[in-house]
Amino acid sequence: MSNWDYLDEVDILPKLPPNFDELRESKKWQERKEALEALLKVLTDNERLSTKASYAELIGHLQMVLAKDANINCQALAAKCIGKFATGLRAKFSSFAGPLLPVIFEKMKEKKPMLREPLVDCSNEVGRTMQSLETGQEDILAALAKPNPQIKQQTALFVARQLDLVVPAKQPKGFIKAVVPVFGKLTGDADQDVREASLQGLGAVQRIIGDKNVKNLLGDASSDEGKMKKIGEYAEKSTASFAEEQAKNAPPVAPTSSTPSASAASGDPSGGTATAVVSSGAPVAEADPWDFLDAFDVLSKMPDGFDTNIESKKWQERKEALEGLLQLITANPKLDPKANYGALVERLQKVLEKDANINVAALAANCITGIANGLRTKFQPFAVSVTPIIFEKFKEKKPTLRDPLVACIDAVVATTNLEAVGEIVLAALGKPNPSIKTQTDLFLQRCFMKLNSQTMPKKTLKTLIPSLIKHSGDSDSEVREASYAAMGAMMRAIGEKPSLQLLADIASDNLKMSKIKEFHQKALDEAGPAEIAEMVKSIHKADAPPAAAPPKKTAPPKKQPEDEEVVEEEDEPLKPPPGDKKKKVPVKENEENEPPVVAPKAELLLSDNEDKKQRIKEEKQLKLVKWNFQAPTDEHISQLQTLLGNQAKVSLMSQLFHKDFKQHLAALDSLVRLADTSPRSLLSNSDLLLKWCTLRFFETNPAALIKVLELCKVIVELIRDTETPMSQEEVSAFVPYLLLKTGEAKDNMRTSVRDIVNVLSDVVGPLKMTPMLLDALKSKNARQRSECLLVIEYYITNAGISPLKSLSVEKTVAPFVGDKDVNVRNAAINVLVACFKFEGDQMWKAAGRMADKDKSLVEERIKRTGVKPGSGVVTSPPTGGPKILVPQQQGSVVRRPASRSRTREPEPEEVQSDTFTIRQDTMPPKTSSRYALRDDVFSSAMGRLDGTQVITPPQPVNGWSNNTFQMKRTNSSSSISSIDTSDQIQRSINNISSSLADVAQDAMFQVTYVLNQPEQRHLVDRRADLVFRASAAQLDLVIEEFNAGRDVSGTMDACTQMLFILMGGVETEHGLEPLNASPDTVKAIISSVLRCIIQIGNTESGYGMARSLNRLAMRLIYRVELSNLLCGLILAMTESLQMNTGITELVSKLSSKWCDELEKRRAQLRASDIVDSFNAFYVCALTELKMDISDSHILIVDNYLERVILQQGDVVLDAARRLSRPHMHLTSMINKILQMMRERKIDPIMPGTLEARMPQEDEAVVVRSGVQVSIDNILRDTSMAVKHIEQLNILIASSDRSWNEYMEYLKNNPMGELIKELVGECSRKKRIDFNLSHVVKSSMAVFKAMAATGPVQEEGRITPTDINRMDTMIVGTPLSRGDATITRARGNMIRPKRTTLSRDQMANIRHTLDRVKNH
């Protein structure tokens, strides 16, 4: 209900200016405008208008101004005033809508937005007041037939917007039938806007009646696949608009559908066509195509000589007459109900009854079927006379006649009901002919399959059951099988217990009952989940007592398979027929014939897949109904049954949606056990299971509720322990209904809810929980209000008020200080006191106006507790927010240096000196971080310089004890924590390029873990450029390792997984945000990926890896910003031609995808950077390599240049002119294409910018070789120097590259001599003796100081990086005139780059070096 309903009606006529009439009739347009502005102001200030006042004259004058006034300003104001009248009067305005629509449509020819936009708004509001679009059908069709394209376009858009408000159950069939062919014609209009508008209108129609009906109405136009695809897209948009409108206007409790007139009379804000917005949200089937067909009078088109031929003695002539009639009926499925078909039906049934030829009789049956289908309920008067004849003819066994008779009896009875023909059916069941009995039983089976316990005619059923029971003992096997099928279908329709009561005579016959239950199960399988849900719901409605509470009705179970039927029989045994008491169903025999009620195997109960993400995505896109209700609706339950039925086993589904709460308990026990046996299946379906739990919250059985809360606790604890993220949709679908249970009277139930809320607080954090807690304060239940306030107080006390400041907690809680309930009052006061502790007097301002009594209560509590303003201390930071969590690990985590190998055995240590360690089995390892990179080594390495402890790491430990479910997460000691998160991520990204496979893989797993955390992935996204560069370096190393014959599958899998997740992106309103990657980075990653594909993909073992890399390259095209992407691709092609890497063809193929992306994204391009890349390519290819101008690569690049020019226009030429030495081919191509564009009058699609890419700080990717790692280990860990030296010797002996690197180190590094002596000493004695400990300390200090300061960097050059771009960096117009100035951005580019250290870091270095000198 909107605010309009609470406003008072206002008569605006007395509020108009005294000279209003004079001004509105003035000849000066300024005065007329002044009058209209005054009227508009009054209408704006008074949104609800009096329905007793007469506004006809005023609205008529506005209509005249809109139609005749020559001034566009006056017309626009008149349109706005009419819209305000429509909004203010709503349903009472409908009488004015008819005359106004033609005027509005006629004025739509105006293109100026000043008038067009008010007209659009006016038409929307006027249309909402109409009871149905059919009332304005003629005006709409006339407007669509106008020659002016603007009128046609705006009218079609108006129709589309109005149809977006219509629910399928209230579809204006006549209007749709008339307008769809017109829209179909307009889809071929010469004007593109008219075509798009008509397609949008057809999309709105398709949402209502379905695509099949739209195709039928469009006829030949539906063969255009492109148009139908667009219509489908607009249909999806219409669905979203309808859902949005429905959510906006739906009242708290969805009422049943009402007629448009009733809605309009009640002042519904949406008017006639929008009445669907407040109707029930039950799923609506696709519209019946029959409703949109033209009625056909078959009697006036009867074949020539029909009357004569039908009476002919020759069966061929009778057959020919009936074939002509059948062809006519088949071609026109909908018959005119006004015609009199009595004589024709009588003649056909006579032929069916008397004709001796089965071909003629079969044709007569088909004709009767066609007439019944064409007339539908209008055929009902003939059903009683035709039905006995059909049953009698069932004695014919031949399919030629039998099959048409089956279709005929179904069609005839569909026009009436089973009760009307009950006596006829009963008579047919008593016939001695077995074929008649068989077909009659099968007919009943088909009837029962369409009925439920509500629609089943019970009296008729009771009269039919004895005959069916009798048939179950018939000597003919087909009769017996047919009767079992009928009784199985009956059991499906009315439920098992009522069926067993009706079948008491054969209840003790296990053979018969097993056959019936077999057909019962087949009937359930044929019906499908949706039909079963409706069926069982009707069963429970029929069984429910008259005074049943509404919540009981809104949670119907699903179905009743055989595995629960034994339980039902044991709980409520049926009374056997008299004389059969001793033949009660034996328990043992049941256990042999039927499966006992035992929980299925845990691993089969729920599927383990990734459908959860898709469900959440569809719910965001409104493709699924939002889980938001005051009481569960049929649509919500049906949707949950469908979704859960796709994941759960049938036996579990039957227990979850059973009527008996004992079955719920059995299902809950099975699900709780899954937490131990198959936790991943619970996590994969946690959203659905928690929704099912919310349905149980609306029930009152204490035992079931306790068990449900136990399952909820198990699920949320599993989510917390495995650090599985919970989406906002998942939380909002569960928590509000969980909080309802905080108001329960039983303390144990409230305690369970508190535990669950505490766990959820750890998972999602107070910021997400608090809005739902505040909303729960609206409850009338005092316990619920007090419990929610206690949780809010806990949040504020522990996390402070700052994270919750935006939620206005104080203002929401303040009114509860005056609550009637003492517990609520105390809890509210405590919340405000907690706020005062953090905010001080600002709390009073945030709380707003409070009653003096309430304020004094809070002040008294503050004084009594002695709380000082601003004394609050955050005891624990809010959990669930943007941080990086570490999964719990088994065993201790140990410190190890950045380059230590993982392959070393675990050797606990005991500290003996500052440098040396002695192994001892009794000392446990200690914990610390692992990596120490140069970027931030001063924050950690210098602090540990005084007491260096080198500890050998153990083997990696699994972080999850269960083999069936493992988190894809590294368990190393360097797992990223919430402390120094940014630095840790930076270290991990740098380690991606490590030459040690285990270090690189570990870093990739850590980055992947962060990317999987929605709250933290932005920390990696903004470093995407560095991740790509590090990955490119690692892929180059992978190629070398692969060529050397080593296994690279682990590294490759980790790398591709990380990059795929990185490029999956974050979902935004407009799709995926482009990743920040510079052209050089794009070139590097593209080149590395393609080289891997070529070198690895040619081998059998690398085929799978190459496929992953191929998809990775395609994903990269979709995610990178277009200018950087094109520049990177051109640079990669240039480099490939220069170095002959063999990837040129692949780069060309990838580049073609850039054109497709340009069409999709329509983004601006940076012409300066792009032209620079093209120029470099042409210089390389044409000047340096002297390639032919007709070479395929040259032509491909020419094509891309043409696309850029068509997109950007003259900006490309300006960019080329700024080049100091543009290549001749480049300028020639640009001039040629621009000349062509001028000749053909082609405008640029999206003129771009000349700005070059802003220079960014270069983040170097540190790649430490294996030689460097080994040498660092020797200097860090002198106690294990011998082992490290052995590793170094093995490494330098393995390849010439390692040997050369080692020699280079000895030559250039200050520590080279020391390393050389240590290696030589170890080679001679196999051990190293350190006599002077202070020398060792000095060496270690020097090594750490060198590691801290990093390598010496060369002085940055003072000239720009690219001399060809000098004129774009130095601003002066031209350079010869006046002094040139250097912009700030360009100044940064040419400024020398020097290493800088903070004062603290320099002080630490000086202090350390001084201490070393003193030794």
Swiss-Prot record:
Disruption phenotype: Maternal-effect embryonic lethal with meiotic and mitotic spindle positioning defects in one-cell stage embryos. RNAi-mediated knockdown results in meiosis and mitosis defects in embryos whereby embryos have one or both polar bodies absent, more than one female pronucleus and display irregular female pronuclear migration, which leads to delayed association with the male pronucleus. RNAi-mediated knockdown results in defective mitotic spindle positioning and rotation in which spindles are established in the posterior side of the embryo and on the wrong axis. Residues 251-530 are annotated as: TOG 2. GO terms for biological process: cell division; centrosome duplication; embryo development ending in birth or egg hatching; establishment or maintenance of microtubule cytoskeleton polarity; meiotic spindle organization; microtubule polymerization; microtubule-based process; mitotic spindle organization. Residues 243-278, 544-603, 867-914 are annotated as: Disordered. Keywords: Cell cycle, Cell division, Coiled coil, Cytoplasm, Cytoskeleton, Meiosis, Microtubule, Mitosis, Repeat. It is found in: Cytoplasm, Cytoskeleton, Spindle pole; Cytoplasm, Cytoskeleton, Microtubule organizing center, Centrosome; Cytoplasm. Residues 1-250 are annotated as: TOG 1. Residues 21-48 form a coiled coil. The keyword Ligase does not apply. The keyword Cell division applies. InterPro entries: ARM-like, ARM-type_fold, HEAT_type_2, TOG, XMAP215, XMAP215_CLASP_TOG. This is Zygote defective protein 9. Its main location: cytoplasm. The TOG (tumor overexpressed gene) domains are arranged in the N-terminal region with each domain composed of six (for the most part non-canonical) HEAT repeats and forming a oblong paddle-like structure. 3D-structure analysis shows the presence of additional HEAT repeats that are not detected by sequence-based prediction programs. Intra-HEAT loops are positioned along a face of the TOG domain and bind to a single alpha/beta-tubulin heterodimer. The TOG domains seem to be structurally and functionally polarized.
